[in-house]
Amino acid sequence: IIHTQEFANADYTGNPVNRCYYCKHELFTRLEPIAVEGGFAVLAYGENASDIGDHRPGAEAAKLFEVRAPLKEAGLAKGEIRALTASLGLPTADKPQMPCLSSRIPYGQAVTPGKLAMIEQAEGVLRDAGFSEVRVRHHEQPGGALAKLELGQAEMERFVGEEMMANVAAQFREAGFTDVTLDTRGYRRGSLNEGVALAKG
């Protein structure tokens, strides 16, 4: 287990648009001496062909440390990786995507352990209720925190029942959220990056 210290870095906790750079920089800083000590010539990480064109500041840290991305280099996208792992009988074939919880917080709003705990607890509520494609976005607002839910389109109809919504809202309040809303556009990978893409033109 590698213990990283990104929360000690204000550049990370301030949550700028290149937050992932500071996270990966911290990780590779810790891994590099371990690789040298173990006699490993190359460090690798999990970027793949589906990530090409997305907002990926962590890739800049990988370039700085000369960390390889073999899945991307082989041209393998997420669907192909899942198919390959299924053919090999690996248990990760159907594992839901689990990007960093900090990606649920809008840029410019501070990343804190408390917020991440709220997000993790809230997403656990939805998964325990049988939802598979879920994201809970944490938005600061006057007087508390808003949870914006993104669910897969196929699962949204099941959510909007009165009893389900009431139960989820109650458990989200227990997690620390004051308000809960459903994004009717459904789950969108990297939805908080949409403003970054627009800014880039």
Regions found by a protein language model. Give the residues of each.
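Active-site adenylate/phosphate-handling loop in enzymes that bind or generate adenylated species
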Residues: 8-94
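General small-molecule cofactor/ligand-binding pocket signal
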Residues: 2, 68, 181-183
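Peripheral terminal appendages
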Residues: 39, 117, 122-201
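Soluble or luminal CAZymes and related metallo-dependent hydrolases
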Residues: 23-27, 114, 118, 164
